[in-house]
Amino acid sequence: NEAWGQFDALKVCDFVRSLDSHRVIDHASGWYDQGGGDIDSMHKYILPIHLRKSKKRAFVVTEFGGYSNIVRGHTWNEKKAFGYLMFKSKESLTKAYKKLLDKQIIPIIDKGLSGTVYTQVSDVENEVNGIYTYDRAVLKIDENVLKDINSQLRY
């Protein structure tokens, strides 16, 4: 994943494929794409997403979003909370999430986007960019807006 160490990505991809040819392989999740595996994987925060077309591999935005909100009393460590883009309220976070999907994700579905992974499902330790809080007690985005916008992600 990213800069955690990408050594011989194509060689490792071939090795994994030799062990199990039925699994989908993302050989360079969000890092230097060498054209291997089944997925052209992009991690994109804040900046616009530009679709890359390929006849051989699925284009997947394997990390995007990172929108953050601190919910007092439901955070692992409020003093060290990190997020790519911080919002002060559930309402402002909901509005930004909807705008992100409306402007960046939904328009490229019909153009070849195969999948997305929003960062992230829940807060983890110092990262407060989850849809749910660290303790999974609070949904940080309005449930009805979340259902409505996410229902548009189906092809």
List PLM regions with ranges:
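Long, highly charged low-complexity segments enriched in Glu/Asp and Lys/Arg with interspersed Ser/Thr
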Residues: 146-153
